[in-house]
Amino acid sequence: MQKTYIWALVSLLASSLVDARSAVFDQTPLDIGGSDDSFDSIARIDPNNNDLLKSEMDKVIASSELLSLHRALVEIKSISDNEQAVGGFLMDYLYSKNFTVEKQYVDYDDPTGKPIRSNRRFNIYAYPGNSASPGIILTSHIDTVPPFIPYSLSHPESASFKRDDILISGRGTVDDKASVACQVIAAMDHLEKHPDIPIGLLFVVSEEVGGRGMSTFSNSRLNSGTYHTIIFGEPTERALVAGHKGMVSFTIRVHGKPAHSGYPWLGRSAVSEMLPILTEVDRLGDIPVSQGGLPSSEKYGRTTLNIGFMSGGVAANVVAEEAVANVAVRLAAGNPEDAKDIIFRAIRNAATKHRKDATVVISNGLERPKGDIEVIFGLEAYGVVDIDADVDGFNVTTVNYGTDVPHWKIYGDNVKRYLYGPGTIFVAHGKNEALTVGELEAGLEGYKTLVAKAAERERS
């Protein structure tokens, strides 16, 4: 890991003055990539000549500030709760570009919920010179889901080589290091042209595991409330997102009584009691509210539930003493508290229908259970999130996934929030996570447009 970090940093910063940490912004013109005359001959390369193809693809990446930064970020493993290496690299990179950079440590929670200070993860807040309270802020997350997948380049088999078709694969290439790289370069481009309008960069940890990074920033002095525009980065296929669904998560824990499987009536199977409960839970998004279901809306469609994890018992010849299931809910309407009430009633009704004397309780999961069946709601819960999408030239959509948008407490009136980024969510978190050079560079242009629109607001 250390070798990877050093190589990435040296390759990107060899020509930079690393000691210039918080001065007037560098006015040197940027080389951010795009079409280049030196690559006009690439179309004549035989795409089946692997060695030559790899060499030319590497040249394309190395010739572009955007593509080189993206590669360096992706090559550094940064699975949630272990973002220190990529954070250190990004801080040094921003220092070298004459940003002032602040490091904000983000606590962990121990099993009892007590916060623990650690230097393994931290947010990064950067701005030009002394402009610590800019009106425009670009933000993305630097953590990824597991497992780590190395950076690689490929090109589709075709009669000719096309620069835009180079496929960049690896964990984080889309979610969310594409947005991180684009936002950095877009900010540098803006400051080169408009040094009188400061812009901030916020890169947070732990977005993939509950949003603790953004919540920490939101509750700190750095959240000054002087901003008028916040641009969040996520893979949106370069569309502006007009909003996304809300989120509720919960765990069901059933306590049974163990016995020999040859005499099941001497025990009580936790697995057998869990099954009818999950059957009822699984249909809550498909039935109307009048029948005990969860709400839907015209904008976001129906509420969906995913039973993502289930375990129970110890062996086939033992009546199961315990069963556990974890469920994620994507709310299409209503508020989280009402949704929790609906979910709890459904679980209780299913449990008592299966066994009349079943006791169902809401629990924090830490204390000794007071019932046969515990319902443990996660700490993260929010309703639908409406977002601005009023900039011309973009497709507009809604998405079903969660983001850091609801974790940022907004202070002040008329603050615009945009959600945008290159790449598609349909490959994020998958083995095939990837995007093309053309998609990444088009994403940068979209960020430039959003920043320019925000700058107009500041002038007015």
Curated annotation (Swiss-Prot):
The keyword Lyase does not apply. GO terms for molecular function: metal ion binding; peptidase activity. It comes from the Eukaryota. Pfam families: M20_dimer, Peptidase_M20. This is Probable carboxypeptidase ARB_01041. PANTHER family: ACETYLORNITHINE DEACETYLASE, PEPTIDASE M20 DIMERISATION DOMAIN-CONTAINING PROTEIN. Zn(2+) 2 binds at D175. Its EC number is 3.4.17.-. Glycans are attached at N98, N395. Zn(2+) 1 binds at D175, E208.
